[in-house]
């Protein structure tokens, strides 16, 4: 059976030499033309629509049709939405408990950073190291505060026999304003390496020590009370008798003011200035390098009182500006 050409106005037999198979039909090569304009086409530039060949300009364009929003269409859309929600919720229930998705925000970033810092502190043992440092830290010395014992006036006969109460409490000074014993050791505070003073080996410089003028009220009153003041070397030389004083200066009389016992149990010691110091307060004294300061009394770890031999001024001075000095044995008249 011979094959016929698919073109309607041709209808002739198609031989194998001129045969063209396309769109499920057999065509003559010269009969394979555009249905609208009649332009000859080939296998590269044709477009088929409804099993008919078309060129590109005349190819029927598919345009989306506009459908009215009817109740039926609304019902279909609602069903589609419900089906989508059901499927999504089923997936959500399936994934529940397996993982949690959390969005990163500043608060979460801060918590993650804090957790990382805590983990590093625990891993490196910072807390244990601080605890060990606190264990080896020297404990503060807290002097006991017994019942204050008033000091009776002393004369030259009873000077060599101090009372047992004063000898037992060698680290106490007495203040008439506070009515009893006052501990000279202040509360130590933890400082930095910049506050360490290498001269006295204590924490805190001389300028940083608390100045308590009330502690000096009784000492200054006793020194300024008598018309003549004497100091002995810190070796503990006994005070002179009244006869020797009257023979040296017949017009001067030795009164018997209340004596102040130093924390070391002696009548004062002498020091020598190794630096210049300018008084920063009214209860301090100024001195130059090389000055001899006598009749010294220790107030606390950083301060003491004494009299400068050169200027005869009495007051407070920093302990890290002086060093112990040995005076010749004997009596030295200051005023």
From Swiss-Prot:
Record lineage: Eukaryota, Metazoa, Ecdysozoa, Nematoda, Chromadorea
Record-linked PANTHER family: LASP, LIM AND SH3 DOMAIN PROTEIN LASP
One cellular component (GO) term of this entry: striated muscle dense body
Pfam families recorded: LIM, Nebulin, SH3_1
Residues that span the membrane, as ranges: none
Biased composition (Low complexity): 242-260
UniProt-listed SUPFAM superfamilies: Glucocorticoid receptor-like (DNA-binding domain) (SSF57716), SH3-domain (SSF50044)
Biased composition (Basic and acidic residues): 128-142
GO MF annotation terms: actin filament binding; metal ion binding
Record key words, sorted: LIM domain, Metal-binding, Repeat, SH3 domain, Zinc
Positions of the LIM zinc-binding domain: 5-65
Protein name, as recorded: LIM and SH3 domain protein F42H10.3
Xref: InterPro entries: LIM-SH3_domain_protein, Nebulin_repeat, SH3-like_dom_sf, SH3_domain, Znf_LIM
Disordered: annotated segments: 128-151, 233-264
This protein's record includes keyword Aminoacyl-tRNA synthetase: no
Nebulin repeat positions: 66-97, 98-132
Signal peptide location: none
Organism expressing this protein natively: Caenorhabditis elegans
Disulphide bridges: none
Presence of keyword Isomerase: no
Span of domain SH3: 266-327
């Amino acid at each position: 059976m011979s094959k016929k050409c698919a073109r309607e106005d041709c209808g002739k037999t198609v031989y194998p030499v001129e045969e063209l198979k396309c769109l499920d039909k057999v065509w003559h090569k010269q009969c394979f033309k555009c249905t609208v304009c009649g332009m000859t086409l080939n296998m590269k530039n044709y477009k088929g629509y409804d099993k008919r060949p078309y060129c590109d300009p005349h190819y029927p364009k598919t345009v989306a049709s506009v459908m009215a929003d009817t109740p039926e269409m609304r019902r279909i859309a609602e069903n589609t939405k419900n089906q989508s929600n059901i499927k999504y919720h089923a997936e959500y229930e399936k994934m529940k408990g397996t993982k949690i998705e959390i969005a990163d925000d500043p608060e979460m970033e801060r918590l993650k950073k804090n957790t990382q810092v805590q983990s590093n502190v625990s891993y490196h043992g910072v807390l244990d190291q601080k605890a060990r440092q606190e264990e080896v830290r020297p404990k503060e010395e807290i002097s006991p505060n017994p019942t204050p014992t008033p000091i009776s006036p002393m004369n030259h006969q009873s000077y060599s026999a101090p009372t047992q109460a004063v000898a037992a409490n060698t680290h106490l000074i007495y203040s008439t304003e506070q009515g009893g014993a006052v501990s000279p050791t202040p509360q130590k505070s933890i400082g930095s390496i910049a506050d360490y003073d290498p001269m006295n080996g204590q924490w805190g410089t001389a300028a940083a020590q608390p100045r308590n003028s009330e502690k000096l009220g009784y000492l200054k009153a006793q020194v300024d009370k008598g018309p003549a003041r004497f100091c002995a070397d810190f070796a503990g030389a006994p005070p002179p008798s009244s006869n020797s004083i009257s023979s040296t200066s017949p017009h001067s009389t030795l009164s018997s003011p209340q004596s102040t016992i130093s924390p070391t149990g002696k009548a004062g010691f002498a020091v020598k200035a190794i630096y210049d110091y300018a008084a920063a307060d009214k209860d301090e004294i100024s001195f130059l390098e090389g000055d001899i300061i006598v009749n010294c009394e220790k107030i606390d770890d950083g301060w003491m009182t004494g009299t400068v031999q050169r200027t005869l001024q009495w007051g407070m001075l920093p302990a890290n500006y002086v060093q112990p000095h040995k005076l010749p044995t004997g009596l030295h008249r200051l005023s």
